[in-house]
């Protein structure tokens, strides 16, 4: 960016002094509370990776990192990631010091399942009051939480209230029709006309006959190894509240509720039984309970449905993952370098409007890809420029964004689930094929790791100021330094320029205007008058230019303006 040109553009900044004032947060009422504001030079952060004063502090603010423990970092050499490995690598995620730029800068971690389980992924839970011994001890987990707290990192854990494993003691007891636990799960007796015991789900039987008690069938929406809970049972509901309290007492900040849209799946209910309304009521009950235990808690649900259905669940959960943002909205526009008629921003505004009508206090949770989806690095064919723009489009939108581990490196996958969950790439291998980083996990099959043979590791990307990793660091810093970006509401604003995707973010102390050029060519246009008084706080590169009353953004470039 030609910095001198901003002096010719009064509505960007009248002078370098005004630049510094806005960037240091002197125009933001909440910025003065941070002691780091006196030692950070925010003007540098506009065009390069530099320290900022990070203001996002609550569990419901900032940027989360979705982390599969098994694949992240191995502290004991058994090839499997563990809690001590995470602790050792925390400084990569956030070292707790605003004055450094070596860390990613995230403010929260979502740990994929940590409970004992017969499966590598952990979504069929044996014991809700313990940790997977593959990952370490409860003491190791508590130590990891303590180290996260020192760095200002909130931790939420995956919680499955929809089903358990068949090895869970609750399910074992439930197999006796006379045991009180029998009603904790969805059982049906042969001949009960209310249920279709021949029902198929995703290519398998929904109802599974108990080999010990012929004529009794239990529901397994995701397979016979995952028996479904019956949340109509009051004792089970009370037990789950005890589970939440147990983990809050350990120090977690909330939960990611797996399969939240399936707890009352219509396929497994008796004919005529209510589905969505009962599910929403359950989630409201559990979220209200969580808040009674920890008022600042942040929990959210996985509702992998269309936006209209998801909006219903927002009424109870308060926050849901925003499916479709990455694999449909962003990826499609970047594949074809076509912003349409500001399509992405308009679709977001429409989706978020549904949430607001359902729950005025909703918190959106955008993401590019997750552990169940092909990685965005592969979807966009490893195109670093497009991956940078994809990151900017969701990290700078409304809500609490979730980065899937390795996404900041451009990791790729196939369609098989195991390929989406392969080891984090800390360093390249030596001549003998062994990882140079001793904490590199090695549990995954070599055939599942082939997609990342050419993906650059953390060690390699940290040496390159233009790498995807370093760009993520910049984006996260601008997100967490500006209240409009981490707690503002999104408003689609059309510049009238073809190829430009743009929106405003507004909170009570600040406004921001976000612009991306999705086309293949540079685009010159005027910033809308309502945002013409704002100063630049982020530009993607030096080739952004201002000429008189117009701004020019190169292909796949991003500019963010902010001020009060």
Question: Where would I find each of the regions flagged by the language model?
Answer:
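Bacterial N-terminal signal peptides
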Residues: 15-26
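Acidic/aromatic-lined carbohydrate-recognition and catalytic surfaces
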Residues: 30, 34-241, 245, 249, ...
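Active-site-proximal helices and loops of the catalytic beta/alpha 8
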Residues: 40-48, 145-146, 153, 162-163, ...
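A structural motif
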Residues: 106, 252, 260, 399-400
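Beta-strand-rich binding/interaction modules
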Residues: 522-541
